[in-house]
Regions:
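Bacterial N-terminal signal peptides
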Residues: 17-27
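N-terminal export and membrane-targeting signals
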Residues: 12-14
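Conserved active-site-adjacent core of cysteine acyl-enzyme catalytic domains
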Residues: 144, 192-201, 206, 210-217
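Secondary-structure boundary elements
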Residues: 145-200
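Hydrophobic/aromatic-rich core segments of domains that either
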Residues: 210-279
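Solvent-exposed loop/turn segments at secondary-structure junctions
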Residues: 183-188, 206-208, 232-236, 256-260, ...
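N-terminal accessory/pre-domain segments preceding catalytic cores
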Residues: 4-5, 9, 27-168, 279-384
């Protein structure tokens, strides 16, 4: 999970202005607070620099939309600074919390910003009063290096995305990205650049931050609104995604979809579809968002993998479930995922298919099967 690298430098400005000069500038009847404000405004422009209003390119981005007007201005200034590879920028706030919130929202909306790793900021003050803040990105690549690396990223991303049909639905696009990243990229805590997308597209090894950033980046290329969500999962720092499909919100956790990550399966890497277009209640027991804004309720099942594929069952009806297993088997599927609505039914289905080996009745001709479980989501995966 990506950390915000902040170094806070305070620069105190000691100002000596004679009473006579103040009288000339402001007149003897001007309230002292107005005089002080005028002085601070002049200092801000002289020392910090005049803040520049930046045209927004992010009005369609989810995290941006959660901000107030002042926060959006700071967001725009941060993004412009990073995209233009500037050394620093004076921001339109004197509140350090606004600066941090705007930064976190930029990182949520733009998973592709691999060329910097955080920021420093200067606080300028006139005695105890803050008169300005200056944002300074911490770049890890030069502008030329960034351009060369971006070309490598684009080459791989374009190759992958070329396989997506032009008429693909939102669901099909998310399924493709989810499967492609899990198949193409290994989970490796020792991987280089694992806090950005370079580890995915160039190194092919990453951790949760790389998976989440790459998922957001690829989905955006396909026209799917998505953000990177940071928080905790299973008691550890983690990153995953929030997506909008056909007007409904869902969660995607590509990292947890990799069976090697959770240790569900130690053989050939498989895909756990429980984290593809999941609901809030699916992740509530394990995932906790730490985003600086409230997350939407993800309640729809329309584009959930199991509903879409007809693999979700409300009851342990073995005639219905067995028929579905046979259908999948005859279609040549090597991996059959079944999801039950509750744990009791899940255990009953597992008893029939696995413990009593009834799976062989539905997969006539199969000589051996293996399986792995995700009991928290009531998912049984059969490998043929």
């Amino acid at each position: 999970m990506k950390k915000i690298v902040k170094e806070h430098n305070k620069k105190r400005i000691v100002l000596i202005i004679s009473f006579c000069m103040s009288a000339v500038l402001f007149g003897g009847c001007t309230p002292a607070r107005l005089i002080q404000q005028a002085i601070n405004d002049q200092l801000e422009q002289a020392v910090v620099g005049e803040t520049q209003q930046v045209s927004s390119t992010s009005t369609d981005r989810y995290a941006y939309q959660q901000l107030q007007t002042e926060e959006q201005q700071v967001y725009d200034q941060i993004l412009d600074c990073v995209m233009q590879h500037k050394d620093c920028v004076a921001v339109s706030t004197k509140d350090e919390n606004v600066l941090e919130k705007a930064y976190e929202c930029v990182m949520a909306d733009y998973g592709e910003l691999f060329w910097f790793s955080g920021y420093q900021y200067n606080t300028y003050s006139n005695f105890d009063q803050i008169i300005g803040l200056e944002f300074m990105p911490s770049y890890i690549y030069t502008e030329q290096e960034r351009e060369e690396l971006q070309q490598q990223v684009d080459m791989v991303a374009n190759t992958w995305l070329a396989e997506v049909p032009a008429d693909a639905t939102d669901y099909e696009k998310t399924k493709f990205v989810y499967e492609t990243l899990i198949k193409q990229v290994d989970y490796d805590t020792e991987s280089e650049n694992n806090q950005n997308i370079l580890s995915v597209f160039i190194g092919k090894k990453t951790v949760c931050q790389g998976y989440a950033d790459a998922t957001q980046y690829l989905l955006h290329q396909l026209g799917i609104p998505a953000i990177v969500v940071t928080g905790t999962a299973g008691g550890e720092n983690h990153a995953w995604n929030l997506v909008n499909l056909d007007g409904e919100y869902y969660y995607i956790d590509t990292t947890w979809g990799n069976t090697h990550f959770l240790g569900e399966w130690q053989g050939t890497k498989k895909i756990d579809y429980g984290y593809l277009n999941a609901r809030t209640q699916d992740l509530a027991q394990t995932h906790t968002s730490q985003m600086p804004f409230a997350m939407p309720a993800c309640e729809s099942v329309v584009d959930n993998y199991f509903y879409r594929e007809g693999l979700y069952f409300e009851a342990a009806d073995m005639a219905v479930i067995g028929q579905k297993v046979t259908q999948e088997y005859l279609q040549g599927e090597k991996e059959i995922c079944l999801r039950m609505s509750n744990l009791q039914d899940y255990l009953q289905v597992k008893e029939h298919l696995i413990d009593k080996e009834e799976v062989f009745q539905y997969c006539n001709g199969a000589r051996e099967i293996t399986y792995f479980e995700n009991q928290s989501l009531c998912i049984l995966t059969i490998l043929l």
